[in-house]
Every structure is written in structure tokens, then in C-alpha cells.
């Protein structure tokens, strides 16, 4: 597996050298782009990542949801809405193989229950800490994250999904077991 750990508090528009765990040596560089920007002329590394459209460089990783079948490199994240993370990845690996990159992006999101859209509201660290202090949390082996289930003052049900350093390590272990070759994002140091 080649790991591309984001530096703590990293801003966009920076390069990250990959590290090949098997060969124990540096690998190709991944460059993080701010939305609507282009890579610097001197960047001759292997790949580019930007979550928003705007870059037309052939080295750009394409999201699996919109990538053409012959895309040279695609990415997905580890945040699944329903089902299981392992099932989601097992569905992608036969299609994309070594072209699949996985973005280890810790989740911290509040969802109404039910949530037909599958889209929650991101919470900042303060709001997340307040929720976890008031409500017991549990580990979800399917989503590979922690969650709190509660009802608000109006009786409406909510679930708060969030990652910890431990759940990120669990996700990383799952990715290794599945044979994922390239992982980038907030990778805990083990």
C-alpha cells in the first residue's frame, strides 16, 4: 500500500510524497489543488486531487461516481451512507482495481433519521464534542466509525457519525486487508 498522509492542518495547494509500505521507499507525489486552480508549472509528480471541479489536467483523480470507464485513476472516500464500507469497497475494486485511490476523510456529520438524501450536516469540533459528551457512543463495524443515536427536544431522531484516530486505523486496516494500493488523507501514524 502507498500512503499519502496529509500534513496536520495542511492547506490546499501542496504536494505530498507517497510512501510505499512494501518497498519502504518514497513513491510518486500527489498534489492537492484548491478548487479552480491549476498545478504549478514545476509539478511533474504523478497525480492531482481536488474535490471541486475546475482542473482539466489529465493527472487529476476522478471521483468514481462520474469517472469514465477508462479513467487512469479514480478516488472514493470512506464515508458511506447505508450498507457497509467493506461492501462498498468490494463493489469498487473489481471495477477499478489498482486505479482506485481511497480518500481517508474522517467523518463528523449529523443526520436526521430517516435521511432519504443520505446527506448529513457537517459539525465542527466544538459541536461534536458537545454531542458526544451528552450521548453515549457506539462503534459501527459496518460503517467503521462511531455513532450516537438520540432524540432532540422535539422528539426528532438523529444519528451523529464520527471518526476517531482508532476508527481511522480500523479503516486503514480494512483497506490493507482488501488490497487497496493507494490511500491518501488524514492517516493516523501507527
Predicted features and spans:
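Catalytic-core region of carbohydrate-active enzymes that cleave or remodel glycosidic bonds
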Residues: 78-99
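Extracytoplasmic/secreted cell-surface and envelope-processing proteins
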Residues: 39-40, 83-85, 110-114
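Glycan-binding loop/region signatures in secreted carbohydrate-active enzymes
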Residues: 97-170
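Chitinase-like catalytic core of GlcNAc-active glycosidases
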Residues: 1-80
Amino acid at each position: 500500500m502507498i500512503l499519502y498522509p496529509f500534513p496536520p492542518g495542511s492547506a490546499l495547494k501542496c504536494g505530498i510524497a507517497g510512501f510505499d509500505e512494501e518497498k519502504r521507499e518514497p513513491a510518486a507525489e500527489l498534489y492537492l489543488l484548491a478548487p479552480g486552480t491549476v498545478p504549478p508549472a514545476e509539478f511533474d509528480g504523478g497525480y492531482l486531487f481536488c474535490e471541486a471541479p475546475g482542473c482539466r489536467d489529465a493527472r487529476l483523480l476522478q471521483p468514481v461516481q462520474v469517472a469514465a470507464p477508462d479513467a487512469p485513476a479514480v478516488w472514493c472516500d470512506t464515508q458511506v451512507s447505508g450498507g457497509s464500507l467493506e461492501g462498498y469497497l468490494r463493489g469498487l475494486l473489481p471495477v477499478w482495481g489498482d486505479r482506485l485511490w481511497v480518500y481517508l476523510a474522517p467523518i463528523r456529520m449529523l443526520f436526521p433519521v430517516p435521511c432519504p438524501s443520505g446527506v448529513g450536516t457537517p459539525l465542527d469540533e466544538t459541536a461534536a464534542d458537545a454531542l458526544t459528551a451528552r450521548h453515549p457512543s457506539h462503534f459501527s463495524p459496518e460503517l467503521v466509525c462511531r455513532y450516537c443515536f438520540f432524540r432532540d427536544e422535539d422528539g426528532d431522531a438523529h444519528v451523529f457519525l464520527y471518526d476517531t484516530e482508532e476508527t481511522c486505523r480500523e479503516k486503514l486496516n480494512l483497506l490493507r486487508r482488501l488490497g487497496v494500493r493507494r490511500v491518501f488523507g488524514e492517516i493516523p501514524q501507527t
